[in-house]
């Protein structure tokens, strides 16, 4: 399975002053823990990191001790542009791809394999969890407009998996139509193409704030042999 990791997080909400994937987590960078999980999945055979040139040396340095090579791909101005760059950099024989947020360093390798396997029956899959909170839709003035039925609400995660040719086509059409999205599954939705949900875990958080980092430290401590 070919695997792309967008890794251009600025770390502004973390107040880190650097790419948040370079922040220390129990003696290693965030991207190290993400790569550790990715390479622990039996389906993984090719990995590309998509990032900004200024971070290339440090990000690849975090990958140097893994047995598998990590390929570098220059990112764009947005996540959407970066993923499209990643797709164009895949080997010509790549038929399927998983795309995973670099900041989701707690991903279970078994879920990665599950996503990969489901691409044998589906052209697009994403990990997601059932929403447990009551969600409110509000107007521009902060007043509640409605409460959607949470039985139909899922919180999207990554990896998100796709047939490569299909996703390339979706990105090309998005450029033509000037569509802006924050994840690749949204492109499929806009084109009325089916995306299969695979139930994920609540521990697969995206590290975006200092409290997220504290949670991640607890998980890493409990999963790392002393």
Curated annotation (Swiss-Prot):
InterPro entries: IspD, IspD/TarI, IspD/TarI_cytidylyltransf_bact, ISPD_synthase_CS, Nucleotide-diphossugar_trans
Alphabetized GO MF terms: 2-C-methyl-D-erythritol 4-phosphate cytidylyltransferase activity
The protein's Enzyme Commission number: 2.7.7.60
Short name of one Pfam family: IspD
PROSITE patterns: ISPD
Site positions for Positions MEP for the nucleophilic attack: 150, 206
Source superkingdom: Bacteria
Enzyme class: transferase
PANTHER family reported in the protein's UniProt record: 2-C-METHYL-D-ERYTHRITOL 4-PHOSPHATE CYTIDYLYLTRANSFERASE, CHLOROPLASTIC (PTHR32125:SF4)
Name of the protein: 2-C-methyl-D-erythritol 4-phosphate cytidylyltransferase
Organism of provenance: Prochlorococcus marinus (strain MIT 9312)
Chain's gene name: ispD
